[in-house]
Amino acid sequence: MIGITQAEGVMTIELQRPERRNALNSQLIEKLREAVQKASSADSEVSTRVIVLTGQGTVFCAGADLSGDAFAADYPDRLIELHRVMDAVPMPVIGAINGPAIGAGLQLAMQCDLRVVAPDAYFQFPTSKYGLALDNWSIRRLSSLVGHGRARAMLLTAEKLTADIALQTGMANRIGALADAQAWAAEVTGLAPLAIQHAKRVLNDDGSIEEAWPEHKKLFDKAWTSQDVIEAQVARVEKRPPKFQGA
């Protein structure tokens, strides 16, 4: 489900579920978490200074595997733990965004410290198409990376963010391919790791990880337990537009 290659101080982790557009099921989440943890382990045989994360095929990650176990009770906790591990590792994670990053795939891309984005890639949160709600961190981080106005368009209308616009907003640091991300990572391995670790920690401790306000949690739970979520799933199977009722 994942491939790992090591070139001196750069570990490249590749999501390998191209038949499902690298959609995240629990097994893939766990494999990815273990790989990231291994990179920062003191017991690791090779010293890793930078992680590069990419996807196999033409899609970076299509999001949660809605035809798999994405609605399992423990799925959100597994995803949160993966994000926590990526946040906690001392080395930078460079996302080589080789194609669309959608839903949970966009969350994964935002959890990366830097992003090199393919020209034909795009970012999208289609939650309003499925009746779902996002956690506060995802909304805050999106706003910090693309600006408040563009974040509103992406969240309220499921608007796509193309690579060229992503470069303008800061969601993309560079436009390029996996090789470009790996070359940049190789450059970073020559920089001072403790200075990088400090900067990453301060940047990530920006207040975006917060306890949801009671009203936020109420609306979040209301969305996830609504009939609209069921309607979206049924409509997807029946290949028709959903008829949302707001209930």
From Swiss-Prot:
Which GO terms label this protein's molecular function in UniProt?
Answer: enoyl-CoA hydratase activity
Gene encoding the protein: echA6
Function description: Could possibly oxidize fatty acids using specific components.
What keyword terms does UniProt attach to this protein?
A: Fatty acid metabolism, Lipid metabolism, Lyase
| Species for this entry | Mycobacterium leprae (strain TN)
Q: What protein name does the entry list?
A: Probable enoyl-CoA hydratase echA6
Q: So what EC number does this one have?
A: 4.2.1.17
Q: Which GO terms describe its biological process?
A: fatty acid beta-oxidation
Report the family membership: Belongs to the enoyl-CoA hydratase/isomerase family.
